[in-house]
Amino acid sequence: MNLISLTRDYFDDILVRLAHHSAGLEGNSISLPATVSIIVNGTLPTSSGATVREFYEIENHKQAFERMASHLINEELLFVTIIKEIHADLTDRLQYDKGQFKKIKNIIIGAEFQTASPAETSDDKLLAILDTHIQFERIHPFSDGNGRTGRMIMNYSLLQEGFPPLIIEKEAKAQYVELLATQDVDSFLSFATKTLEKESKRMIAFQSMDQEKIKEIE
């Protein structure tokens, strides 16, 4: 997917949904309308009842996503330095060791992590990206923020390979957690394929600004 060709409305739509659902998978209670207010206007409705931490968990997605987009536009490969940058953005004002791999007995856990190797077909590429996500979450290289970071860098790889973004909705949390726990990459592929097909339709609807189709997809 060429980010430059995306409309601003669809770019913001991806960002809002990614922030809402990715944070929601970790227990964030901020609603989708409140997420729109945070991402677009930088304000949190007083009626939301959200904590300061929840606000930053949402707001930090904006700087992380925009950094990711900048790297992708420059056609930069996903190196460990970029992963650390994205983690630092997502955990800004939330943890003291942002952007740093955790250490146990002087061993850097993140050193075990490697990004997906090149693959030939689209299915091979998608399978490799999903498997890398499973392994990233298994390793848990950071002290906190692994879920949000893992999903962001998974989308980095997907967008770089021409796929739509994979936004895992918080309503699918039980299935998603099960897929990670069992490391069932084939079932994850089936789950992701259906979700990506839906996202492709949403992208097309945004390009034609067909509001009725957008509502149907939702």
Predicted regions and their residues:
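FIC/Doc superfamily catalytic core
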Residues: 1-218
